[in-house]
């Protein structure tokens, strides 16, 4: 639990440093907004935040407070609105901290194979596509029916080891097209196109 608390503190600090497009003080801190998004992935439940808000209203506390140290729970729409402009690179320190903590505690030794080497698995994946919604940073493709699809993709890197049932995700590279070109390249995605946030439409 001490290691988890340390990692959550690092994530809290990274989220607190997110650029804030609001000109005045908002109802929710950027730390609470970022941690709310993280909690959805951590708990793997789309209804997690709405249920926690109902607990907060009835009991004045929730798992968001006790597990993630959040002060207030924003709505899903507010989370999307505030995180859209945040560049993924603001989370680099959180990914680095996971590896650094494992090295410090000797956890990386479990992943060493082939004479002390660390194996990294690479996988390209799409995390958004739509025939209705698109943005200037979307990749595009034509289907046989003539319709255009818009999509975002990334190259995911993960530390793995044969016979080990756990993996360590590294900072992904978001696949963006260069300005004025149609070819794809792995690079840091421009603002508003970074974090997985929108379901298929």
Question: What is the predicted function of each stretch?
Answer:
Residues 51-58, 93-106, 185-191:
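Short, motif-level signal for alpha-helix interfacial/capping segments enriched in acidic residues
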Residues 48-50, 62-74, 91-95, 109-110, ...:
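Short, flexible active-site-proximal loops enriched in glycine and acidic residues
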Residues 10, 14-18, 54, 82-85, ...:
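Residues that form generic nucleotide/phosphate-binding pockets
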Residues 80-164:
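Active-site-proximal, Lys/Arg-enriched surface segment
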Residues 3-74:
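Gly/serine-rich nucleotide phosphate-binding loop at the start of the catalytic core
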């Amino acid at each position: 639990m001490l290691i988890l608390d340390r990692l959550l503190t690092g994530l809290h600090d990274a989220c607190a440093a997110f650029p804030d497009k609001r000109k005045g003080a908002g109802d929710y801190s950027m730390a609470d907004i970022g941690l709310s998004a993280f909690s959805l992935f951590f708990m793997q439940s789309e209804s997690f935040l709405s249920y926690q808000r109902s607990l907060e209203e009835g009991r004045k506390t929730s798992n968001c407070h006790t597990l993630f140290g959040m002060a207030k729970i924003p709505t899903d729409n507010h989370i999307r609105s505030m995180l859209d402009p945040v560049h993924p690179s603001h989370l680099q320190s959180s990914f680095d901290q996971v590896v650094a903590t494992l090295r410090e505690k000797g956890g990386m030794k479990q992943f060493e194979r082939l004479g002390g080497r660390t194996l990294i698995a690479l996988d390209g994946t799409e995390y958004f596509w739509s025939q209705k919604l698109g943005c200037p940073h979307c990749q595009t493709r034509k289907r046989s029916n003539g319709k255009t699809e818009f999509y975002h993709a990334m190259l995911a890197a993960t530390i793995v080891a044969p016979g080990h049932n756990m993996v360590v995700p590294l900072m992904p590279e978001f696949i963006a097209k260069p300005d004025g070109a149609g070819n794809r390249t792995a690079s840091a995605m421009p603002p508003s196109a970074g974090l997985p946030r929108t379901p298929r439409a």
